[in-house]
Amino acid sequence: MLKVKIVRLNKQAFLPVYATAHAAGMDVSACLEEPVVVEPFSTALIPAGFAIELPIGYEMQLRPRSGLALRSMITLANSPATIDADYRGEVKVILINHGPQPFTVNNGDRIAQMVVARVEEVSFEEVSELGETVRGDGGFGHTGTVRS
């Protein structure tokens, strides 16, 4: 199991936890002095109250919680959000309200999930052309919407 250092920056912060034994992501909770209202079609930056030190070669992704998206149309504005291994500041979540009603975030509300993953460093080789494939440059819906 990978060990990741974590610092609780606020005594009321909830540290990330796996909700079930085989969950891929850990729940991230809001760390707030007072509730924050995310107005319709607006964003809010919500602190999590902790900072992490990832090993080199890893990243942390913040992702939406499906239940929030389904019930309240709340998701992450930059999904997935990447926390790099050299970042040492407080983890914060950019929530966006796609719904028509204001949404209130309270201290301790589970607002996102985080997944720690390996990252492969790459170098680019500039070439004059790329190898051919059946797909070629087809993209953005080129395969249609109906399964045959």
Swiss-Prot record:
Keywords from the UniProt entry: Hydrolase, Magnesium, Metal-binding, Nucleotide metabolism
Its domain of life reads Bacteria
The EC number(s) attached to this protein equal 3.6.1.23
* Catalysed reactions listed for this entry: dUTP + H2O = dUMP + diphosphate + H(+)
Q: Tell me the organism.
A: Chlorobium phaeovibrioides (strain DSM 265 / 1930) (Prosthecochloris vibrioformis (strain DSM 265))
The record's top EC class is hydrolase
| Gene3D superfamilies, sorted | 2.70.40.10
- Essential cofactor(s): Mg(2+)
Q: Which family does it belong to?
A: Belongs to the dUTPase family.
All disulfide bonds of the chain are none
Q: Name one GO molecular function term.
A: dUTP diphosphatase activity
Q: Which residues bind substrate?
A: 65-67, 78, 82-84, 92
Which pathway does it serve? Answer: Pyrimidine metabolism; dUMP biosynthesis; dUMP from dCTP (dUTP route): step 2/2
Q: Name one GO biological process term.
A: dUMP biosynthetic process
The answer to keyword Metal-binding applying to this record is: yes
- Originating gene: dut
Report the function annotation for this chain: This enzyme is involved in nucleotide metabolism: it produces dUMP, the immediate precursor of thymidine nucleotides and it decreases the intracellular concentration of dUTP so that uracil cannot be incorporated into DNA.
Question: What protein name applies here?
Answer: Deoxyuridine 5'-triphosphate nucleotidohydrolase
